[in-house]
Amino acid sequence: MEDRLYEGIAQQAGIAGCTLVDARMVRTGRAVALQVFIEKDETTAVTIEDCAAVSRQLSLWLDVENPIHGAYRLEVSSPGLDRPLKNLHDFERFKGSQAEIHLHGLTQGRRRLQGELLGVEDQKIVLKNAEGRWTFALDDIHKARLVPQW
């Protein structure tokens, strides 16, 4: 997704009183969906009204700016229990939670790790699992998400 589109979506979510967690274009068969994941703040759950407000705000902006060529479906929702971790603030905020991290390259023979987030130290993400303590730069991470505990 282009930076301009992502930044525009983040700005419109903010106007509607929410924060963008992630956005992505997903193709299923011939259909294309713009999936937008939002949160309210760290203590307030996203409601259906929040999703509707962001959807209305985004629809207006998308119609005027027309950054997406062709037909698409707009989907706005909360990120869910397995929310993505996108920035250093997320990794610090969810310290103590279980997370799964996929790396761009191999680190000690591993590309995927799961364990407890220990937070951020010296601008590096710290994860602990049965194999030890792991430290990564944000740029080393391809994708990361919380792993819900039942």
Swiss-Prot record:
Q: Which Pfam families match?
A: DUF150_C (PF17384), RimP_N (PF02576)
Bilayer-spanning residue ranges: none
Tell me where on the tree of life, at the top rank, the source sits.
Bacteria
What InterPro entries does the database record attribute to this sequence?
Answer: Ribosome_maturation_RimP, RimP_C, RimP_C_sf, RimP_N, RimP_N_sf
Can you supply a Gene Ontology BP term from the record?
ribosomal small subunit assembly
Q: Name one GO cellular component term.
A: cytosol
Specify whether DNA-binding is a keyword of the entry: no
Its annotated compartments are:
Cytoplasm
Q: Give yes or no: UniProt keyword Transcription.
A: no
Alphabetized UniProt keyword annotations: Cytoplasm, Ribosome biogenesis
State the family named in the UniProt similarity comment for this chain.
Belongs to the RimP family.
The entry's function note states: Required for maturation of 30S ribosomal subunits.
> What HAMAP family has UniProt attached to this entry?
RimP
User: Per its record, how is this protein called by name?
Assistant: Ribosome maturation factor RimP
